[in-house]
């Protein structure tokens, strides 16, 4: 009898562990979006944009046209996928809060219509599935929490503030039709959907294709 109970208990534990792992190991991956942006030859219909913020910086002054050439932007055609970097008109509500905020902004599409986005412990989840992408986790200059604290001189930073940043959390938000959820690549250096919620499709001006060749 004792042996039978032991076997049943073992099976119960194994099943419980298996079921628990399903909820934590399901992931959404992005194998199409490159972390490094290349150059493109602009066409007549394309926009050439200057961007002087470090909000998208992953360690190489990314997207910053003070270091790189102008950004080539394809006018919005109604088609977007996760990982796309878009050029959009900042929401009036944010401009009213900060008069120094740029009226035209960049952000990366993270959540699409009918998806639920949340952030827990610095990690983005889509419909409760971990977003396994370079832009799906809190970074600073492209460095993850572990990489950052191994690299920086702790005497030069506020460790408590950076710990808090790398553990950023946000309540779930359902992405409505005709909207997207956007994030900058260096969350603490820019304004995005963590601040203003969903971005209306009508605010999107275009998609960044690359640096001008």
Where do the protein language model's features map onto the residues?
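Alpha-helix-centered segments that form part of catalytic cores
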Residues: 154-177
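Protein maturation boundaries and topogenic segments
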Residues: 2-102, 170-172, 189-213
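Active-site neighborhood of phospho(di)ester-bond hydrolases with catalytic His/Asp-centered motifs
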Residues: 112, 181-185
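A short, compositionally biased
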Residues: 42-44, 117-122, 177
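Hydrophobic beta-strand signal
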Residues: 70-73, 87, 118, 125, ...
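Surface loops and adjacent helix of pleckstrin homology
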Residues: 76, 91, 122, 129, ...
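Acidic, glycine-rich loop-and-strand cores that form catalytic or ligand-binding grooves
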Residues: 130-155
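Mid-length scaffold segments of soluble, non-membrane domains
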Residues: 102-133
């Amino acid at each position: 009898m004792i042996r039978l109970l032991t076997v049943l208990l073992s099976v119960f534990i194994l099943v419980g562990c298996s079921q628990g792992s399903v909820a934590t190991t399901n992931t959404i991956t992005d194998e199409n979006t490159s972390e490094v942006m290349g150059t493109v030859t602009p066409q007549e219909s394309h926009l050439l944009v200057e961007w002087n913020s470090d909000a998208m910086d992953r360690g190489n002054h990314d997207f910053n046209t003070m270091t790189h050439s102008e950004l080539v932007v394809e006018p919005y055609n109604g088609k977007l996928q996760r990982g796309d970097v878009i050029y959009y008109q900042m929401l009036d509500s944010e401009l009213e809060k900060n008069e120094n905020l740029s009226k035209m902004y960049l952000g990366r599409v993270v959540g699409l219509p009918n998806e639920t986005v949340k952030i827990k412990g610095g990690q983005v989840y889509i419909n409760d599935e971990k977003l396994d992408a370079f832009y799906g986790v809190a970074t600073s200059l492209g460095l993850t929490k572990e990489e950052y604290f191994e690299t920086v001189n702790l005497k030069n930073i506020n460790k408590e503030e950076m710990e808090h940043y790398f553990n950023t959390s946000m309540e779930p938000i359902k992405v409505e039709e005709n909207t997207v959820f956007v994030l900058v690549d260096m969350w603490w250096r820019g304004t995005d959907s963590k601040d203003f919620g969903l971005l209306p499709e009508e605010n999107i001006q275009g998609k960044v294709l690359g640096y001008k060749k």
